[in-house]
């Protein structure tokens, strides 16, 4: 079979044998692709750090029976350096990568919109100019929109009556009117659904002006909505929710953990 090229984000990797790795890629034109990078764990590997998670690359692959084979890699954007340097950025980035893999669908199904959204989100996280919690929630909302799971925010999820509506019910699909409101609905504080709409629409001026209390409520609703559709919790989200306010590097975090181990031992 013929070689093919594509733009890709490296989502994750794991060891294969003594020198190889299997990489999971979110490509623009071929969706999720799992491929073998031969010899990448050797110090003289021609691929080096270009196949680390968070990398945005131009990749050439040879189709295989079960796994494709990476034959060439060119770096497009080196997001990893800035993301890994800060623990908050790192956990936010990990949540983005995990979400992208879960929402990409079947392997080799083209995912240009999700690929474009993921690249933009990683670029914003690496840049560090916007609050990480807002960046992540905006990404989750828009990624769910691409997958067809976005919550109803401006109309009733059941009858489509235009809002705003105060009640919110995850299993029904988002905001619900007083007539359709099912048992178990929540009533988020004023401004919470408006903030979700601002994040979905990319209205960053309104989003960044929202109080911390509204941002916390939004994070909870967005995470719950996503996990209801996925039918399980993302492994990385609890870490982001706990540590996103701390501007501590990965090295500092590891040093603190080592210090705790020493003190406890």
From Swiss-Prot:
Enumerate the InterPro entries for this protein.
ARFGAP/RecO, DNA_rep/recomb_RecO_N, NA-bd_OB-fold, RecO, RecO_C
This protein's GO cellular component annotations are: bacterial nucleoid; peptidoglycan-based cell wall
Against Pfam families, the record matches this protein to: RecO_C, RecO_N
Q: Which UniProt keywords apply?
A: DNA damage, DNA recombination, DNA repair
Which GO BP terms sit in this record? DNA recombination; double-strand break repair
Task: Give the transmembrane region(s).
Answer: none
Entry superkingdom: Bacteria
Leader peptide range in chain numbering: none
Q: What does this protein do?
A: Involved in DNA repair and RecF pathway recombination.
The cross-references to PANTHER family, in alphabetical order and at most eight, read: DNA REPAIR PROTEIN RECO
Q: Which family does it belong to?
A: Belongs to the RecO family.
- Protein's name in the database: DNA repair protein RecO
Gene from which this protein is expressed: recO
């Amino acid at each position: 079979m013929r070689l093919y090229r594509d733009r890709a984000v490296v989502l994750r990797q794991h060891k294969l044998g003594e020198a190889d790795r299997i990489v999971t890629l979110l490509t623009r034109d071929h969706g999720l692709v799992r491929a073998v990078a031969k010899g990448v764990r050797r110090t003289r590997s021609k691929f080096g750090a270009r196949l680390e998670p968070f990398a945005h690359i131009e990749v050439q692959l040879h189709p295989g029976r079960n796994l494709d084979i990476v034959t060439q890699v060119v770096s497009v954007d080196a997001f990893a350096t800035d993301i890994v340097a800060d623990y908050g950025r790192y956990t936010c980035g990990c949540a983005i990568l995990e979400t992208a893999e879960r929402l990409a669908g079947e392997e080799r199904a083209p995912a240009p919109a999700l690929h474009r959204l993921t690249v933009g989100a990683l670029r914003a996280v690496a840049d560090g100019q916007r609050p990480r919690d807002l960046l992540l929630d905006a990404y989750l909302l828009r990624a769910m929109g691409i997958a067809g799971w976005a919550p109803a925010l401006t109309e009733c999820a059941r009858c489509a009556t235009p809002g705003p509506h105060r009640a919110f019910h995850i299993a029904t699909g988002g905001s619900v009117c007083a007539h359709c409101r099912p048992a178990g609905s929540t009533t988020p504080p004023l401004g919470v659904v408006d903030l979700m709409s601002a994040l979905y629409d990319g209205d960053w001026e309104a989003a960044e002006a929202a109080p911390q209390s509204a941002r916390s409520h939004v994070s909870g609703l967005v995470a719950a909505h996503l996990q209801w559709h996925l039918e399980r919790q993302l492994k990385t989200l609890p870490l982001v929710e706990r540590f996103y306010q701390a501007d501590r590097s990965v090295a500092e975090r590891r040093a603190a953990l080592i210090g705790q181990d020493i003190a406890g031992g």
